UniProtKB/Swiss-Prot annotation:
CDD domains: ATP-synt_V_A-type_beta_C (cd18112), ATP-synt_V_A-type_beta_N (cd18118), V_A-ATPase_B (cd01135)
Cellular component, GO, one term: plasma membrane
Gene Ontology molecular function, alphabetical: ATP binding; proton-transporting ATP synthase activity, rotational mechanism
Description of how the protein assembles with itself and partners: Has multiple subunits with at least A(3), B(3), C, D, E, F, H, I and proteolipid K(x).
Originating species: Natronomonas pharaonis (strain ATCC 35678 / DSM 2160 / CIP 103997 / JCM 8858 / NBRC 14720 / NCIMB 2260 / Gabara)
Membrane topology of this protein: Peripheral membrane protein
Protein role: Component of the A-type ATP synthase that produces ATP from ADP in the presence of a proton gradient across the membrane. The B chain is a regulatory subunit.
The name this protein goes by in its record: A-type ATP synthase subunit B
Family according to the record: Belongs to the ATPase alpha/beta chains family.
Keyword NADP annotated: no
GO biological process: proton motive force-driven plasma membrane ATP synthesis
Amino acid sequence: MQKEYKTITEISGPLVFAEVDEPVGYDEMVEIETPSGETRRGQVLESTSEFVAIQVFEGTSGIDRNSSVRFLGETLQMPLTEELLGRVLSGSGEPIDGGPEIEPDEEREIVGAAINPTAREYPEEFIQTGVSAIDGMNTLIRGQKLPIFSGSGLPHNELALQIARQASVPEEESGDDEAGSEFAVIFGAMGITQEEANEFMDDFERTGALERSVVFMNLADDPAVERTVTPRMALTTAEYLAFEEGYHVLVILTDMTNYCEALREIGAAREEVPGRRGYPGYMYTDLAQLYERAGRIEGREGSVTQIPILTMPGDDDTHPIPDLTGYITEGQIYIDRNLNSQGIEPPINVLPSLSRLMDDGIGEGFTREDHPDVSDQAYAAYAEGEDLRDLVNIVGREALSERDNKYLDFADRFEEEFVQQGYDTNRDVEETLDLAWELLSDLPKEELNRIDEEAIEEYYVEDEQAAQTAD
């Protein structure tokens, strides 16, 4: 029998403090009934022999000392079934799409169990996003965690939607008639506005991407406490689809900055000693608990790949949120404000971007045999073009050699033709590599010193006029 308490002593922001006379488990679920008869859900955040701190999912407005508290003896769980695909849920896992109630095959605690390191399979095989700057230069690998670093006002939401629409596992698609049936997307939105939520849903429904997706929506006016639950709900669903149903699951979480702000708000309500810039000292551990749920398990068909998106306050990549994220994850994709102002879509700056696992999932047997060399050469050529732009600002373009001008032209074309593709263009990896070769072929063959000679002979695009002159 559940015991009921009317011992609330304090209410602070999203937290309720109550006295108890018996042990209460950490993370235990709680029901709070207000004097008006309304029931709110909560979770034990801190427990001692004399009192508990409860975080309330629906907010503390209307709760007072006369409210009753019931401890349910279980932790927060996510109802799981393959039928979740195509559904839209609140940040706490409740259906909000007008569809039927979820009839779960099982329920799991949202905290999740760590993958045994000895059972982890090393991430291999690439995921095709259809975005050249990612597929060609910073390839996403199955089981990887690759964040997108953005800034306020930049189009990271548009890029997130493009990836959600286009992402696929090419060999799975070509392996049977049900193209893409083994791929699923979990989209977890935290602290977004109603306008952004409407844009997300319109895009999912218009493009048909919702059929293979599970969407979790936590809005800006929803309680901060729910924001801390949303990514755990999303990842628990991803783990079930990946390791029980055999899907390759891509988890897109936006915006992790809002998640960390919720941690700070709750920490302040608990009067915790703050860490860097007021964020909790345990934020690194908390983020690691989320990001480390990506991966593959030996003997299981599926995989969980993560793309967390975060906006860097003040475009500062030394801010605690991107800084700690960078320590845990395996690279980063940078959204660039200057490229955005030039109208480049998506404005991905490939130079500071990095995919640490890229080399393990590209090349012969994965993408194409020339991919590693082409990527290296394009990086080098674009970097040289960028350096020369700085020089042009000092001495003018007329002072540069013919060779230098070719690299400047390459840098311009690289941004305008390779990075630029719009948010509705889906390029497969063959198109991406062919486009890279077209740009690299503007450089003399002797400049392509990072590419194997056989690949140059096969893919280098000879200038027709030059070829006729040589004949």
